[in-house]
Amino acid sequence: MKDDKGRSDTVNGYYISNSKLSSGFYKRNNANTASNDEKPNLEQNDIPSVTSSGSSTPSSISIEKEIKISKGNVIVKAIRSWSLYVAIIAILLLLVILHSFQGRPQDNGCGKSYVWPSYVRFVDFDERYTRFANKYSLYLYREKSVEESDEPSGIPILFIPGNAGSYKQVRAFAAQAAHVYANAYAEDADGTLNAGKLVPDFFVVDFNEDFSAFHGQTLLDQAEYVNDAIPYILSLYRQNRKISSEYDNEAFPPPTSVILLGHSMGGIVAQATFTMKNYVDGSVNTLITLATPHAMAPLPFDRHLVEFYESIKNFWSQSFLLSPEENSLDDVLLVSIAGGGLDTHVVPEYSSISTFVPPSNGLMVFTSGIPSVWAEIDHQAMAWCENFRRVLIRGIFAIMDARTSKCTVSLNLRKELLSRAYIQGSSFQNDITQISKPIAQYKALDLDLTYVYSEMPGQLLFLNQLGVSYIRHHIFPIPKPTSSIDRFELLTDQPIDLSSSNIKVLACRLDPKIDNTISALLENGNNKVINANCHLLRELVTLLPASTAYTSSPYGGDSFYNYVLPKEKMDDYHFILVSDDSKAPASGFVVGGFSNVSLDPKTIKGSQIELFKSGRKFQFDTKGSISKRFRFPGIQSSIMAYTISVTYELYPGAVPQKEFTPMLKQSIESPFETKYHVNMSNTELSVHGISPFMEFFGKESEKSLTLEFFLNPAIYKSVYVSIQPSYYRSAGRLLMRYRTLLASFPVVVISLAAYNQFRYFHYGSAYLSMSAALEVMIRKGLIKLLFLVSILSIAFSYLISRVELIVADGADPVASWKIFAMMVPKSFWKQNHLLFGLQTAQFWFLAPLLTLMFVGLVITASVIILCVMHLLAFIYGIYLRYKGLTFTGVCQAVKFSFQCLRTRNTRKLDHGEFKKLSSFLSQRNMYYANPSLCYVYGKKHMQARIIGIMLLLLMAMTVVPFQLVYGVALCTQTVTTAKALHLARFCTKSSHYRKKLWDFYNFSCTITILMLLLAPLDFPVLIVWARNLSMHWSIPFPTHHNFFSIIPFILLTEILRTGKMLPRLNDVEYYINNVFLFLLSFYSLIYGAEKPYLIHNVVGLYFFWLLFLYAKNGFFVQNISKWPIIPRMKYFIKHKFLRSIS
């Protein structure tokens, strides 16, 4: 058929020419034919019997022979279908997970911080220093309430914001640092300067809120910019230090390194600076990261982001395996601070650094265990939490030392001071740099006011009120030898680490000129005074949250002080002195004494099955110690939550204290996590230990839960503990750890559904709809799939090489780490990134449970997509009506077209009857009466499409990322599918032709759903690109101009746009097609969590196969041969080129 412009048309399997319209219009293409009578569904009368176009002739499959199909209307079919109930189960599971996730403890123990900010931009930091000068900026923060000069002259600290983070997030930390220095300088200016403390100069980079979590190249650009900024920052001090009049310039050399403070992905940028080519050796020696996902990328959808992570971890781990002379990181300290369970952006376990940093150069803590914080903090609050910033800046201020060019103390001292600040704690009045130095005091104790306790453990000091008893001095003689005791321990609510405290706990030596034992002094009745040299050992004091009858959470209240003197340090002393110097009655308590109970935790054994079934129950006596520790080898997974109930048996006549109620401390060693539960009776337990998809590194005992109970042994006689699994609370913990599978696992389900579509289509049936294919998959393959994932989960959990070595107690931790680090890379199974990442076989049941949920969610999503397609088809029908259709014209077109079909004669189209319909309006009526004619495209239109494709591909290879072209292809395919649905629903031609339209729609819908599932993997890069475009940043994405990543999608969508149905396959093609579908399903199932970005390539490979099938049946030859340029090229080659050569 030629239109008024001379275009020759193709109608979905029928070829129209100007000369042989009749024969061409009804030329049969067996590859596209199905002799059905009705719209394809699962009814008996819809099962056709059509032979395949291949060499073999398989018999038609009867669906009812394999699956019992219900009769009735749509509602009855839906009620009786298995898909509905699987979808309902999946939705219920998802709702339980979401409700559990939202119902987790939400208490945020953060106070708001108040600042007076001022930012100084360095406009001189331009293209002379960095190629990113037009994109990023560098600022210096100044707190106007205490700082007047805008010139940096102190100690440089560079803050790096995270994903979509603002440079203004530095204000809370910088303001606190400015106040800390101002207060210290005002209190003792000379002492502050002599200690090497100068004003902290907080610099900050402005990344214009880049989406660094989505794109590896963006992280590389940011790391390069940071390395460009560091030398510029250091250059500012060479002149400013010389002209400063606040201190002796000779005592403070110009700095050669900066301290990096990174929030979220800013911590990864800080860590990556060492791997860049423009890094200056020694320019950074301390990194502190806040809520940074060091172990894994939070969204591994970008190939270069995952490779970026791997390169960083490999660089760090391999560097520490070198000798100190060759290791560029030998003097670098990395401190990682995680926010805990309130962080909904980053999985807390991802902040672990133990796999690539040895204990000598790394420190990892959770905010729930940081003294004076004792709270989980959400991701954004890490940048402004008042309680947290006080402790954080206190640690940074402690390690600063401007007397050296590195501006920090030595590596060992840095870790010791930060451990003191972030793990052990101390009163804020103390200078933590001086805590390790004992405070000497000489004591002359009046024996009339002194009580001497027995040398044997068991006798307890218990003061329920201070300043009341006439006994003011309590002496605990240290037995010689000390083998009969393990330690001296004391707990109080008084700040015993201050020399001004009313309660003093001192380790004392007797005056050797008088006597050297307490017993000798007491036997001598003439002595009225005990003279002793005593020391306040502040490093033995650890801060604990206050646990009273009035506290409900560990944060926001006062502190307890726990004093523990191990027997190894008792040899230099004769007795422990506890003095009550209160001059008037005061509230407070003291409980303490010798303990012969080891601090080593007692192991509570039991099988994992028993733990899941009935939990753990045990009891213990409190006699002999304030604290008791227990370890639970089976409780180590981060996806399981528990509830703990504690009941107490009191001594007869004892009354519970209000000032000190029982407290529970839960902890694991790797990663180091501590959490406190005050006023303990019932609470929830969960750990951030072994996590899905995380490397198993170190000893298993380091990841087991340890519980430590603090209580008054003078009141409580026995404790009864019951730990029960909480499956409801555990459900909420699955969301954060398996959210990436929401993007990859649906591909598994759709691939298996496509297999069923091709299977029935190959054996003569209609091409099943997605709903029917999913129903078949559920009835015939769901049990097999659940069984498969269960077996694979168990097998993978046992195949993982955990590199667990028997390391002697007390062995050098650095040497042990190197052994682990050297053995882990040698194992292929070193990481459990496969399938669901389950590292213990006991959790195998999660695999089929999650699989069932994902299958049901795919069913739900497919129903939603089909509804959207029907809506788009309806809109398309309205569009056709508004293109000038009339009821009379439609009726004439219907009548005319049926005459042609009935007589099998189209000569009328060449004569007067067609002339009557040749107007634009009449042609539209004809299209609406025969919707298949809407697939007709002329030569010029096809040429325009080809030119458009070539332009898109050229742009994808040069200017825009291929993900943008993919979005265009997805939109085109969506419109094609909606159009196909409209044509199939309103086609007025024969039932056989209408069947072809339904087959084409179902096939196109499958392709559309598959492409839609890839969108979450590709669109994050588009967000980054659009962000750069909005900032007028024109540097292209060199890593996202991949021709082969987009060409199969473009070509296939263009083929489908012409309405060409995939031909039936012969047996060989059918089995090859199955291999491709199973490959796609297998890869998405096994590697979907580790490398989901490669799913795009696997789908592209499958689309190449579909293109081959189209090409094999002559689609490209038939269409390309019609281009006018083809005969011209033949004429040119034959008559011009060949003649010129001859």
From Swiss-Prot:
Subcellular location as annotated: Endoplasmic reticulum membrane
Keywords assigned by UniProt, alphabetized: Endoplasmic reticulum, Glycoprotein, Hydrolase, Membrane, Protein transport, Transmembrane, Transmembrane helix, Transport
Biased segments, Low complexity type: 47-59
Pfam entry (one): PGAP1_TMD
GO biological process: GPI anchor biosynthetic process; protein transport
One Gene Ontology cellular component annotation held by this UniProt entry: endoplasmic reticulum
Catalytic residues (positions): 264
Residues that carry a glycan: 596, 679, 1002, 1028, 1119
MF terms (GO), sorted A to Z: phosphatidylinositol deacylase activity
TM region positions: 81-101, 741-761, 781-801, 849-869, 946-966, 1006-1026, 1035-1055, 1075-1095, 1097-1117
EC number from the UniProt entry: 3.1.-.-
Topology in membrane: Multi-pass membrane protein
UniProt keyword Amino-acid biosynthesis, yes or no: no
Broad class of the protein's primary localization: endoplasmic reticulum
InterPro entries xrefs: AB_hydrolase_fold (IPR029058), PGAP1-ab_dom-like (IPR012908), PGAP1/BST1 (IPR039529), PGAP1_TMD (IPR056824)
Function: Involved in inositol deacylation of GPI-anchored proteins which plays important roles in the quality control and ER-associated degradation of GPI-anchored proteins.
PANTHER family: GPI INOSITOL-DEACYLASE, NEGATIVE REGULATOR OF VESICLE FORMATION-RELATED
UniProt family annotation: Belongs to the GPI inositol-deacylase family.
Name recorded for this polypeptide: GPI inositol-deacylase
Organism of origin: Schizosaccharomyces pombe (strain 972 / ATCC 24843)
